[in-house]
Curated annotation (Swiss-Prot):
Subunit and interaction comment: Homotetramer.
Descriptive protein name: Deoxyguanosinetriphosphate triphosphohydrolase
Catalysed reactions listed for this entry: dGTP + H2O = 2'-deoxyguanosine + triphosphate + H(+)
Top-level class of the enzyme under EC nomenclature: hydrolase
The protein's role, per its UniProt record: dGTPase preferentially hydrolyzes dGTP over the other canonical NTPs.
Names of required cofactors: Mg(2+)
Top-level division of the source organism's lineage: Bacteria
GO molecular function, one term: magnesium ion binding
The keyword Magnesium is annotated on this UniProt entry: yes
Length: 506
């Protein structure tokens, strides 16, 4: 396994700072401790406490929010990282793999990536994501504007993004932007949030660890088979493309490859949410522990004494009632289920990381660590299938998701006058903070948060010297990003209340 040197991957350089050096182990550790402080103290992490995990607008604090889920993922990620490093130590590979001064940073990068992994998610989870994409797809008609030549079927509602005869280069840009704006994705928004909006100036290694997918949002070409898993979702937007190119150079990553520690973050998320969703469903009385056991055993098939299902789920179920008076049967069951599941899946994830280390290190390993034909992965899949069949399609969940979809779609409708303004008028509104001819738009603009307005202004200034046609296209792009940034950054409750206020429903 020559060629594996984690010093080439774990870079402590920052995009907005001068190149720095750190010689001893503690100096390197301090750099990543600074990352921890920036992340933990960021507003994006605080907002996770009022964002949906499964149950939107949940008042029961025992049911998980995105924040409590992320804390659980952080702990599992730390455990997997420690397991991997311990195996490297036992095999006397620490120095050979360039990790002798990077043990603490290795763990810290994984932990903080786990804590951050959901910060780009909009209100109401995947339904909020769908609402944003559906709203923009209807107006962008990305498939009607593919390529460089106008099509008779093109139904784009934005004049500046309509393809025009004889404008090949501009049409390619228009097509890119139409696809990009129609592909809002929480993982891509996380990259935008930490770099362009919050400007946390994190190390390249720390941000590389949350670059879960490697496809740009504007991508419309066929996906290469060698990377069809890594590119199954958008990983970053056109707005952050230059930054991602810098990151790849700094971390020695080929195009479409992944940062090696990202595989650990992904495995920790898979392990954590599969148990959490089921525990929350029991807390919400969607089914009982006994019913849950029946659902899981049906998905597993024939259970034989000593198989993995029996050791993990069966062993937890057999503990019911054994500690009456000390804890409830539900708490008892999930305590043992969690311990048993983590105890089996964490070593399996660590082993998969090590067995596939050359491909994992290069970032070309085209699957998840917990995606193979093993009994451990079968167990994980049955947890997920039970959640899909019996939790996500529960009437209460579906009703709240429909409400969330309507809220996000409605907010986009409400703020759409800002997108309909001519470029010159919007530019004047930004410069003067008001526009006499656009009183409604002025008031909507005032509701946007300062950090989002500043990010737009900075982007607009950066493209100021482009030819006028290019400038108008990019200006609209960053204006649309401004609206997406603002609405996707809301908490569930704020989005719900804002929608009601602006619809005069209260």
């Amino acid at each position: 396994m020559s060629g594996i040197d984690f010093k080439q991957k774990i870079s402590f350089q920052r995009p907005f700072s001068k190149p720095s050096s750190a010689e001893d182990e503690y100096e390197i550790t301090r750099v990543f401790e600074s990352d921890r402080g920036r992340i933990v103290n960021s507003a994006a992490i605080r907002r996770l406490q009022q964002k949906t995990q499964v149950f939107p607008l949940e008042r029961n604090a025992a049911v998980r929010s995105r924040l409590t889920h992320s804390l659980e993922v952080q702990q599992v990620g730390r455990y997997i990282a420690k397991e991997i490093l311990n195996r490297f130590k036992q095999d006397k590979k620490i120095t050979a793999y360039g990790l002798d001064k990077l043990l603490d940073p290795f763990e810290s990068i994984v932990e903080m990536a786990c804590l951050m992994h959901d910060i780009g998610n909009p209100p109401f989870g995947h339904f909020g994501e769908s609402a944003i994409n559906d709203w923009f797809t209807k107006r962008m008609d990305p498939n009607g504007g593919s390529g460089s030549e106008p099509q008779s079927t093109d139904q784009c509602q934005v004049d500046v993004l309509k393809l025009c005869e004889g404008e090949t280069e501009l049409n390619i840009l228009r097509s890119k932007i139409r696809h990009d704006l129609s592909q809002f994705e929480g993982n891509a928004q996380a990259i935008r949030l930490v770099h362009s909006l919050l400007k946390l100036n994190l190390t390249y290694a720390q941000v590389g660890c949350i670059l879960k997918y490697t496809k740009p949002a504007y991508w419309s070409a066929p996906i290469p088979a060698s990377h069809n898993y890594l590119m199954k979702k958008p990983g970053f937007y056109l707005a952050e493309e230059n930054y991602v190119k810098e990151l790849r150079r700094e971390l020695n990553m080929e195009e479409f490859d992944r940062f090696p520690l990202t595989y650990i973050m992904e495995a920790a998320d898979d392990i954590s949410y599969c148990i959490a969703d089921l525990e929350d469903a029991v807390e919400k009385n969607i089914f009982s522990v006994e019913q849950l056991y029946d659902h899981m055993s049906q998905e597993w098939g024939a259970v034989t004494p000593g198989d993995l299902f029996d050791k993990v789920v069966g062993a937890a179920f057999r503990q019911l009632g054994r500690e009456q008076g000390r804890r409830s049967s539900e708490d008892q069951f999930f305590m043992y289920l969690r311990v048993n599941t983590v105890g089996k899946l964490v070593p399996h994830a660590a082993q998969r990381f090590i067995e596939n280390l050359p491909a994992v290190f290069s970032g070309s390993f085209n699957q998840a660590l917990l995606e193979d034909s093993s009994a451990a992965c079968k167990l994980l899949q049955i947890f997920k299938r039970v959640a899909v069949k019996h939790v996500f399609n529960h009437p209460e969940v579906e009703q709240l998701e429909l409400q969330g979809y309507r809220v996000i779609s409605g907010l986009l409708d409400i703020y759409s006058p800002l997108l309909a303004m001519p470029e010159t008028a919007f530019t004047q509104l930004v410069a003067d903070d008001r526009h006499r001819k656009y009183p409604i738009e002025t008031r909507l603009f005032h509701k946007l948060s300062i950090k989002h307005r500043l990010a737009y202004a900075e982007s607009a200034e950066r493209i100021r010297n482009l030819p006028s046609e290019q400038y108008e296209i990019y200006e609209y792009y960053y204006r649309a990003r401004l609206i997406q940034d603002y609405i996707s950054g809301m908490t569930d409750l704020y989005a719900y209340d804002e929608y009601r206020r602006l619809m005069a429903a209260e």
